[in-house]
């Protein structure tokens, strides 16, 4: 009974929740969640809000589960009556926009989610017109909820990003990548016309090798001059065949 009384002693009861570091996450919602976690008693006797017996593990678990934009989380007591929650938010580097490019161009950019640099989906994205963010169109599997999922293994995702960066360095401008049912990738390039040219490559391709092949081809004057001079009429560049770079223009 004495310990129960001590746990409720006002001097040691947390009454103030401060949330810092948020930009997009609602700080008030975080504070409300923490207050909910520390309300009530343990086994009807010991007050959860007592600074010495706070349910810190549950607070951490609940924040990370509900606010998946959270990348780093620090929970710190300030005196006896204040709890400071410091959050570092994930930054959105890319978008995942479903399993395929919408046939209706007006829906491009709808229903997208932010991805971090590991390919982890952590938040819904507002509508962006144009190509503000690079987009991934990759099937997640049946009944897989997007939030909290990885679009690809972290290793594969980073490998594709490295390939995209390499293509960009060659003077081309990737805007999205699609993985179709045949496990083949289509890397779409920006264009001033309605139809975007694309680079085709296989899922099992060694991306370092095919990037090297593309680099070698672009450094050949005849290839470079033809592709760049007719860029807006380019249909595709095909890297699916070993040590070959094929290309085709729209007729």
Language-model segments: which ranges?
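Charged, solvent-exposed interaction patches on well-folded alpha/beta domains
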Residues: 1-18, 23, 27-33, 41-251
């Amino acid at each position: 009974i004495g310990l129960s009384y001590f746990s409720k002693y006002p001097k040691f009861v947390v009454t103030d929740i401060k949330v810092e570091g948020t930009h997009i996450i609602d700080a008030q919602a975080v504070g409300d969640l923490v207050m909910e976690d520390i309300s009530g008693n343990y086994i009807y006797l010991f007050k959860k809000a007592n600074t010495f017996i706070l349910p810190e593990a549950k607070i951490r678990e609940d924040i990370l589960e509900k606010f998946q934009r959270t990348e780093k989380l620090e929970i710190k007591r300030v005196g006896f009556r204040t709890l400071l929650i410091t959050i570092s938010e994930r930054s959105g580097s890319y978008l995942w926009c479903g399993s395929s490019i919408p046939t209706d161009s007006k829906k491009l950019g709808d229903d997208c989610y932010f991805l971090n640099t590991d390919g982890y989906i952590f938040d819904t994205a507002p509508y962006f017109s144009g190509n503000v963010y690079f987009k991934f169109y990759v099937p997640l599997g049946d009944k897989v909820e997007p939030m909290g999922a990885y679009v690809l293994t972290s290793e594969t995702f980073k490998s594709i990003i490295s390939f995209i960066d390499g293509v960009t360095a060659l003077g081309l401008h990737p805007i999205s990548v699609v993985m179709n049912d045949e496990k083949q990738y289509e890397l779409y390039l920006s264009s001033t016309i309605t139809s975007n040219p694309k680079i085709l490559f296989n899922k099992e391709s060694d991306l370092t090798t095919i990037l090297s092949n593309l680099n070698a081809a672009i450094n050949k004057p005849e290839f470079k001059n033809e592709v760049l001079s007719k860029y807006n009429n380019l249909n595709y560049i095909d890297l699916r065949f070993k040590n070959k770079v094929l290309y085709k223009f729209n007729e």
